[in-house]
From Swiss-Prot:
It comes from Pan troglodytes. This is Olfactory receptor 1E2. The keyword Glycoprotein applies. GO terms for molecular function: G protein-coupled receptor activity; olfactory receptor activity. PANTHER family: OLFACTORY RECEPTOR. Glycans are attached at N5, N265.
Length: 314
């Protein structure tokens, strides 16, 4: 109520992507295909983990939550982008804009925490294989997931409430394809220093520290594997960490660059491209990087298909 009492505008205008009119249809088809790939890939992972008891392990508990987070993360922004591209109506109500920002932060933060949990799970599995079951107990894993949801909900609500207290005057044009927090702060006509300090401090806790923990976990994994100096060991280290670290670097690199270390001469096009990387590309790649190409998931898919063909097959 506070935000609505102080603001003199009822909606914002999302400029969307800087593309030419003749490219609209092609871009619409491309983003629709990427969004459907994200939905189907992540839904398949969730269903397989739910149906196959062989996948009821800590790693796949984290993976199922990551897939749900990716699915929701993309669904917060991409449907509105597709709607605007199709209808040529860039407006979004004030309340809807804050709601979109809230859930964007929630699921983005949740992904950050889950990536840390997955890195720690791999660290324990490779460096302490004999103690894996004792360390990664069901209670610990469920507690980590529950705590991640609580912390991300609190963080998203904090930023939403701080944004709602700001005044927005004449300028309501957001040069972005979603209600980005930094873009909204630039439109505010009241003091935003508190918001900026909270972004910097909480961003360090939510983004930078998890990123460093992930790098530390994978560094220990590589160090542990390379203690056996063999070509096979090196290949195993690279296959274990290389693809995972590429997605982690893509996600955290763009987030840190956009929100914690913004460039003074940063252009709207550059910011939009960087945002597309972690809102569209990363959620689409995660199912392929983390799950769909490994033997456990392929085996689970085969077992589920066989059970559907022969219900009496155990």
């Amino acid at each position: 109520m506070m935000g609505q009492n102080q603001t003199s505008i009822s909606d914002f205008l999302l400029l969307g992507l800087p593309i030419q009119p003749e490219q609209q249809n092609l871009c619409y088809a491309l983003f629709l295909a990427m969004y459907l790939t994200t939905l189907l890939g992540n839904l398949l992972i969730i269903v397989l983990i739910r149906l196959d008891s062989h996948l009821h392990t800590p790693m796949y508990l984290f993976l199922s939550n990551l897939s749900f987070s990716d699915l929701c993360f993309s669904s917060v922004t991409i449907p509105k982008l597709l709607q605007n591209m199709q209808n040529q109506d860039p407006s979004i109500p004030y309340a809807d804009c804050l709601t979109q920002m809230h859930f964007f932060l929630l699921f983005g933060d949740l992904e950050s925490f889950l990536l840390v949990a997955m890195a720690y799970d791999r660290y324990v599995a490779i460096c302490f294989p004999l103690h894996y079951t004792a360390i990664m107990s069901p209670m610990l894993c469920l507690s980590v997931v529950a705590l991640s949801w609580v912390l991300t909900t609190f963080h998203a609500m904090l930023h939403t409430l701080l944004m709602a207290r700001l005044c927005f005057c004449a300028d309501n044009v957001i040069p972005h394809f979603f209600c980005d927090m930094s873009a909204l702060l630039k439109l505010a006509c009241s003091d935003t220093r508190v918001n900026e300090w909270v972004i910097f401090i909480m961003g360090g806790l939510i983004v930078v520290i998890p990123f460093l923990l992930i790098l530390g976990s994978y560094a220990r994994i590589v160090s542990s594997i390379l203690k056996v100096p063999s070509f096979k060991g090196i290949c195993k280290a690279l296959s274990t960490c290389g693809s995972h670290l590429s997605v982690v670097s893509l996600f955290y690199g763009t987030v840190i660059g956009l929100y914690l270390c913004p460039s003074a001469n940063s252009s709207t096009l550059k910011d939009t491209v960087m945002a597309m990387m972690y809102t569209v590309v990363t959620p689409m790649l995660n199912p392929f990087i983390y799950s769909l190409r490994n033997r456990d998931m392929k085996g689970a898919l085969e077992r589920v298909i066989c059970k559907r063909k022969n219900p009496f097959l155990l």
